[in-house]
């Protein structure tokens, strides 16, 4: 039986999974959500001996019901292969009494590889299924990691083109160089003069621009998205939470049915939403702990029920979380207001016009599955330093935010449930911040000179992704003002 997807702002608009992947965003600007959240047909015990690829198949077939087994397995095989430097794909590492789900073993050393390795294959399969003749233009805003992972995934994929926008001063040097050296005849990257929220809003506006869509169609193009607003990004992320639980079970760390807590460093709310979907699938997750940095708009939302983006935007050492408009929260809002598309639309309009909204007490009660915390810049650095001193384990800044919040939550609540932390990036990606936290003397060193030092202290070999950029040629130098994004896209495409 097919699982259909509908726009959260208009329940009458129903599409198949492959159509939702192609569209990215519904024509009314709403995000696609499953008509009903699926349940896994198998127990955790039955899945515990499966490898990552087979686990991903069991999870994704529940959501992508119009894909045949052959189509889905083919996408999975092409995605999760030797591009990953660990055959477990997402290894679970125990450090003291906490488990780190390392999601950074892919081609661009960030968790975005977990979904963006497969999205191009899901997209091209969807295009064939729906007899799409237009070239698909992937339009993406990035706070650092999505951009490179999407460019690497879509580079030279037939029938596609990708244009990435990133905030000029809002990414690390390594992240910027990763993007600006990306090869591929169908790849463009643009630095905007503004922050990530400007980039994301600009991309959304282009998706909703019907006149632009017509101009593109006349030239044989159509837009889609590689951001987590696309369900083709979100669904593959559900798989690794299922995999984490089954590995704990297989390793004898937990008993079947024993609940775990999951801590996720959160910016755009996609990664933690995937964990929420995993819980609904049947994974015994007790608490979903949302970890924020100094841009703590989500922490405040979970505390008060008011989402308010009217605040100073802080540039932190965990830039992938420097976000004040968390797009995927809209999907959760839709669920907690009883799938009321009118109410969801009303709240999103309020956010657009006033920059804030407040949920009802009844809706807030439905957030009991979540806990939230935040980590200041000092606490994040301490988290890296102390974990390294005690255990020798080196983590990146985003993972450190989650580790701090995990400790904070345990201390406040007394909850000793076993915790899995989503470890979202390699420390090599944020080498300056990581090495400065380990030893303050590194604060004035050149970022690239610190790479061999990190290898020395961590004992983890320098990833290929880093070696590749050290002597790579810069191929992209486009820049634009935030209000000129549409003109830039038209210029690139010759529209």
Task: State each model region's role.
Residues 1-495:
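PLP-dependent amino-acid enzyme catalytic core
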